[in-house]
């Protein structure tokens, strides 16, 4: 569910700006997302630049 919300925000960002953000925090700073969700224990959110999606990766 958190991943889905992050990817929806990322899609809005890409539609508005035409590029990927450098960092996920930019989605919050520029009000595409109210806040970054908590990451599951032992995982972190990352931008998969090749596929233009946010994924969970091991820390």
Describe the residue ranges of each PLM region.
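Extracellular/periplasmic head regions of type IV pilus-like filament subunits
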Residues: 1-4, 8-59
